[in-house]
Amino acid sequence: MTTIKTSNLGFPRLGRKREWKKAIESYWAKKISKEELDQTLTDLHKENLLLQKYYHLDSIPVGDFSLYDHILDTSLLFNIIPERFQGRTIDDDLLFDIARGNKDHVASALIKWFNTNYHYIVPEWDNVEPKVSRNVLLDRFKYAQSLNVNAHPVIVGPITFVKLSKGGHQTFEEKVKTLLPLYKEVFESLIDAGAEYIQVDEPILVTDDSESYENITREAYDYFEKAGVAKKLVIQTYFERAHLKFLSSLPVGGLGLDFVHDNGYNLKQIEAGDFDKSKTLYAGIIDGRNVWASDIEAKKVLIDKLLAHTNELVIQPSSSLLHVPVSLDDETLDTSVGEGLSFATEKLDELDALRRLLNQNDSVKYDKLKARYERFQNQSFKNLDYDFESVRTSRQSPFAQRIEQQQKRLNLPDLPTTTIGSFPQSREVRKYRADWKNKRITDEAYETFLKNEIARWIKIQEDIGLDVLVHGEFERNDMVEFFGEKLQGFLVTKFGWVQSYGSRAVKPPIIYGDVKWTAPLTVDETVYAQSLTDKPVKGMLTGPVTILNWSFERVDLPRKVVQDQIALAINEEVLALEAAGIKVIQVDEPALREGLPLRSEYHEQYLKDAVLSFKLATSSVRDETQIHTHMCYSQFGQIIHAIHDLDADVISIETSRSHGDLIKDFEDINYDLGIGLGVYDIHSPRIPTKEEITTAINRSLQQIDRSLFWVNPDCGLKTRKEEEVKDALTVLVNAVKAKRQE
């Protein structure tokens, strides 16, 4: 009988209580030394490695741990340093500056990692001299060995790394070939150090364009075969189906496939005989992207099917566990829902249960997990009826008519200015919210504090000269979690944090039941803010697509049904704001693009459903009420027509890190709705210059009608310091005032 082995593709960096984030931000704030930072992160890395060892994994990943982002780590490994940062020592401070920017230079672009809510730092190839320059991967592998951990190194593969890069004059194929000797050098150093195999992540090979990469992929891995290292390589794919017959023809030692998010195709390919049995199959059978406990009995059935077509089988999560929280141990959850959950640590336990059952005929842990899953499934979370048909899915009048009524009502100037919604969440703001949640202060004391903070920032905005104001969202910890706390059908955990980008962590709510609006969510704060000024104050909501994409979704209903349930709830809040006299309502959809399926065959239906849900949430208002939306971090070319179909009166889009590349997407579409392209990067502490903002405006106006153009930062300002925000917005408004005089 074949012995089943277990492995993992990656583990969360954050720590159970965000120790990683706190240490890094303390270092940035100069509250701890570099030595203290290094010690804290070393301790956390050790904890991660030993935890995985506790669950008897046969091989544990190293190289997944990072000080910021594993793609940026790979850039530094190969000396792919942005030209503006070249000439410096390659160390952690350089890494942080590339990721965050500094007073002299803008940060590198930040892009979604495939269709997840993780973001990577885009490698830049302009005038680089690739070489192996900082082999942190080797250092971390040796550290794992010192702990007696059976580890395997993890590195993003050459095809994926280059495809996710930008800049330079070489072709895609030329860049790959440039890197091959460097990958070889790194592989050899790891093998010489004792690596039994090396995990080479090539998720780009599950995308639509993967067939066009097959020639260069074959050339790359043939090169590694000639170098004598290919048999030590395991190509890991995840998030979708792969072209198994092609991958099986490559001269590597093993292949990793996703058997959760592949829509059943990978198993069909296995059963069709497309897998080369001389290789080891690394089967991603435990969902690495969602928090629900596995149907462990179904996983055993899947393993039995795979065993009929493989000689060596390793079971693993479907992807890195980076995308889920660390552990349920610190949560105090209602048993009715808690029994159905599985975070990163619990997923390792599921793998261990299957290993024990299949290798040792030890069913104790398996039987326990099976009974727990069955208890959860026997509950009913489908209790509500919905009347989707009675709610409008289109505005009363076309945009050309609406905008006339809106302009009469709002009386906005040429090139109106606004912000995206949130203002800095100072330590005081966070402390008051924590004290209120933990019942250390009264509701009245907390409400008084919020009103004072709202009033202070309304005055700041008026003094700066912004045209459309916001209340600042000081009552919100997160733009999705806030709504998860207030809508029926959501569960919000205490420590369910996941990394979004850099030190930015989010705590996605868990959708476990039918979603319903039961009371106003944002009306009080917005109405109070509006009472303080004659300028319009935007109501600020998160849209249904983003709430779904940034939550851990239930899997017992189709996505569209859950999305439309959320849309009806947001529609109720939109109407409540309108009834309270709010003239401008923003329904943010920053995650619309990121949820786009990796395979184009699913795009049309996804976008159709997304547009319908947004319109379900926003179309019931009167013509004179102006609907805004916001999107960020996205490559919009594929969805530009869907963005237009949303029929939002104004859309603001993050573009600053892409240096205006997005504007090209408007060349093939006559975009005739209001639009603001972000004119400066809020993810960096750097204050933009008046000239930079003017240049961004001028470039935008080459493609966009001036009468439709708004000027705004590229995203919310929650993570910035107060003085940074004031200074940057002052520069923005002054640049616009000068532009109005032209």
UniProtKB/Swiss-Prot annotation:
Catalytic activity: 5-methyltetrahydropteroyltri-L-glutamate + L-homocysteine = tetrahydropteroyltri-L-glutamate + L-methionine
Positions with a binding annotation for 5-methyltetrahydropteroyltri-L-glutamate: R18, E19, W20, K21, K112, W550, E594
Record keywords: Amino-acid biosynthesis, Metal-binding, Methionine biosynthesis, Methyltransferase, Repeat, Transferase, Zinc
Comment on bound cofactor: Binds 1 zinc ion per subunit.
UniProt-recorded Gene Ontology molecular function terms: 5-methyltetrahydropteroyltriglutamate-homocysteine S-methyltransferase activity; zinc ion binding
Membrane-spanning intervals of the chain: none
Gene3D superfamilies: 3.20.20.210
Pfam families: Meth_synt_1 (PF08267), Meth_synt_2 (PF01717)
Lineage top rank: taxon: Bacteria
Binding site for L-homocysteine: I420, G421, S422, E473, D588
E.C. designation(s): 2.1.1.14
Residues forming the catalytic site: H683
Residues binding L-methionine: I420, G421, S422, E473, D588
Cofactor: Zn(2+)
Pathway, per record: Amino-acid biosynthesis; L-methionine biosynthesis via de novo pathway; L-methionine from L-homocysteine (MetE route): step 1/1
Biological processes per GO annotation: methionine biosynthetic process; methylation
Top EC group: transferase
Positions contributing to Zn(2+) binding: H630, C632, E654, C715
Assigned protein family: Belongs to the vitamin-B12 independent methionine synthase family.
Record function comment: Catalyzes the transfer of a methyl group from 5-methyltetrahydrofolate to homocysteine resulting in methionine formation.
Name of this protein: 5-methyltetrahydropteroyltriglutamate--homocysteine methyltransferase
